[in-house]
């Protein structure tokens, strides 16, 4: 009997220890980094710095996009996901995922851009034209620019025709007169200016500073682990940001910051942006 009890207690002890070990490892995905090799290359220095600061072990979970990431979280395959504002809204609606840390980048806003020689002066002048919005469902390339059109009194897919073109293809279409404007964020303006040095571009509308990218957490992760993650960013933010921006792929975060007091309400503005493209239920990504 004593041997049986001892064996039982030993088994319970092993299970408890296993649970603690598992809890000390967090599974981490990034929605816009495709594949494990790219994830290790772009986020490796950040991973090392975070593990050293937090005492938690990070296990990369590669995904091929936002849909795979939300499905992985639904299947309890991933704990934390770094994603954009528009994607967060869907994660929250589908899974009740919550924001833990905001990843802010400087000058994160949407614009509408035309050729400098264009007769278009305001968004209202684009009525009846085609407009390219880059990546469909993107906060800064799609929802934000559409909101600028809505603020000018133009209804999506009614007063103008939305198209979705690769950025450089969109510029070529703009030069050819096939589209009237392009929806971009600030860094994209810099990119096309460098890519097309013989062209002059003009911004006809600039949006608000958009809500930041966000590290979100699955509902089943323990509050203690969530608090450890949040505290690590709050106390070691400068070191983590330096590690993050050590790779060229994360240059967009240079000059940015981490915010450990982010709330779901901070993304209500994105929900309103979705409404501008006719979406009032947020359980599916825009495809």
Model-inferred region functions:
Residues 101-122, 214-218:
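Hydrophobic/proline-rich hinge and linker segments of small-molecule sensing/allosteric domains
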Residues 23-29, 34-45, 217-287:
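An extracytoplasmic/periplasmic, membrane-proximal ligand-sensing/linker region
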Residues 1-9:
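Bacterial N-terminal signal peptides that target proteins for export
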Residues 17-19:
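N-terminal signal peptide c-region/cleavage motif recognized by signal peptidases
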Residues 96-104, 201-204:
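A structural signal for short loop-to-beta-strand junctions that line the ligand-binding cleft
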Residues 52-62, 77, 151-164, 198-200, ...:
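A local structural motif
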Residues 118, 129-231:
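Pocket-lining segment of extracytoplasmic ligand-binding domains
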Residues 30-32, 62-66, 76-89, 103, ...:
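Beta->alpha turn/N-cap motifs
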């Amino acid at each position: 009997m004593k041997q049986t009890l001892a064996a039982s207690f030993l088994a319970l002890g092993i299970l408890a220890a296993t649970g603690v070990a598992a809890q000390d490892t967090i599974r981490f995905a990034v929605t816009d980094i495709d594949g494990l090799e790219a994830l290790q290359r772009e986020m490796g220095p950040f991973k090392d710095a975070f593990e050293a600061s937090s005492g938690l072990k990070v296990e990369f979970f590669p995904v091929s996009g936002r849909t795979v990431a939300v499905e992985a979280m639904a299947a309890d395959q991933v704990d934390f996901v770094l994603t954009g504002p528009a994607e967060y809204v869907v994660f929250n609606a589908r899974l009740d995922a919550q924001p833990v840390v905001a990843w802010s980048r400087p000058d994160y806003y949407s614009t509408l851009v035309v050729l400098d020689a264009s007769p278009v002066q305001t968004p209202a002048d684009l009525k009846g034209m085609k407009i390219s919005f880059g990546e469909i469902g993107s906060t800064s390339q799609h929802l934000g620019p559409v909101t600028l059109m809505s603020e000018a009194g133009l209804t999506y897919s009614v007063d103008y025709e939305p198209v979705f073109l690769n950025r450089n293809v969109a510029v070529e279409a703009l030069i050819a007169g096939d589209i009237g404007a392009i929806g971009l964020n600030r860094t994209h303006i810099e990119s096309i200016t460098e890519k097309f040095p013989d062209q002059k571009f003009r911004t006809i509308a600039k949006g608000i500073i958009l809500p930041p990218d966000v590290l979100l957490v699955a509902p089943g992760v323990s509050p203690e682990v969530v608090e450890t993650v949040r505290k690590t960013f709050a106390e070691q933010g400068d070191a983590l940001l330096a590690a993050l921006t050590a790779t060229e792929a994360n240059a967009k975060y240079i000059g940015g910051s981490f915010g450990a007091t982010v709330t779901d309400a901070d993304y209500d503005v994105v929900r309103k942006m979705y409404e501008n493209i006719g979406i009032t239920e947020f359980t599916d990504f825009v495809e």
